[in-house]
């Protein structure tokens, strides 16, 4: 081989070596930048240096949860709930041969990775206070899971007074931890403050997918136990009375897990013609109330349940003539965010923000704008009857069924099968200035009438229910006798397929039994038994 060829090959090797060295250097630089960025993120998210030493994997944190524990989690609806530790616990339990059970406390419903997967894995012994998951519902209705369905505003006091067992360990999602070891909550507050205060240990999930700009939305204020309880100093929906963090302290935090997963909120269905008709009827009623001087021009603070009908009603307010509105509610969904964006709402107070997957990018993009209009509170404050009565809430919630005297069933299908739970509807219904329940007049393609002679389960009595709205019309029950209520509901709210049947029942009951609230007890629940036997109430 000639000397020239050797020199040429040597040069090529040197060039390759140089290229390799450059690539290695680039990788080192990139790695350094990643490490530097990670350190910067950690510093912003975990501002207490000693607590940075408590960062562990989700698997390590899950090992801290023991069989028989009372486990409490943050969040309210699929917002602000822990994402990774619950998954790790499911994986751990599925690998075990022996039984592993916990009692689960939440604020409200939660993510499917908890309610759904834990139910399927047989992890949950007892569940309090509310759920919306189909797997959980199945286990509740077959008796596998003991379910205590309670008014959401009661939960914190039950824990504070040890009416229910104390919390062993709380798993809390956070935006950040402060220098003092306190927690900046994310999109769902719920019972977080109460859980943290009462838990022996706290696992914190720092979720980098939750924007740091969420800091400042929370207004954390907790109540003293009676007899030392003081009036809550809220006189309008926008009042801030607490802190922007949940008091914890670094000693109580036993583990920190870094996550990067967005809330898996539910997509909202399109507004159906029936939902739109309910919305139109309700807004027409509110307009009439303003014209008659029963409501101010900007209404009173609005509380609304969740779902397509509620969304349609609130969406209708965007197209209405109302302005300078306020909301004092639980869940802030798309329609409330849109009320803010369209300039109709000045302030919205709730305990969680639960935008649909379609609305989430817009919320994040405009988060600084929304932060000036939104207040997130613990649910014992967002759902507090004292405040609802003081500020005069307009409460709008959904009924499963209503009877001719205005009693409402919100929870049980055919009287026995749990659907979701009472949630916060009872917190507001008895204490609101105006209590409205909406429902479609029929279900199951017309085989079920949502207005029946007697409800198969009672969540809200006739004494709490003021107005019923269906796509057929509005029944204003205020100041009416039971017999007058029956006529108003049958004439205004019942589907044509069932109107004559209901009037026939009512007239027969008046003749056969009479009384202030006439019922034929032999036939009062016959519509339900007929459906169970034949598949139709007709």
Curated annotation (Swiss-Prot):
Forms succinyl-CoA from succinate and acetyl-CoA. Gene3D superfamilies: 4-hydroxybutyrate coenzyme like domains, Acetyl-CoA hydrolase/transferase C-terminal domain, Glutaconate Coenzyme A-transferase. CoA binds at residues 305-309, 420, 424. The keyword ATP-binding does not apply. The active site is at residue 330. Its EC number is 2.8.3.18. Induction: Efficiently transcribed only during growth on ethanol plus succinate. Keywords: Transferase. GO terms for molecular function: acetate CoA-transferase activity; acetyl-CoA hydrolase activity. Belongs to the acetyl-CoA hydrolase/transferase family. SUPFAM superfamilies: NagB/RpiA/CoA transferase-like. One of its GO terms (biological process) is acetate metabolic process. It catalyses: succinyl-CoA + acetate = succinate + acetyl-CoA. It comes from the Bacteria. Pfam families: AcetylCoA_hyd_C, AcetylCoA_hydro. This is Succinyl-CoA:acetate CoA-transferase.
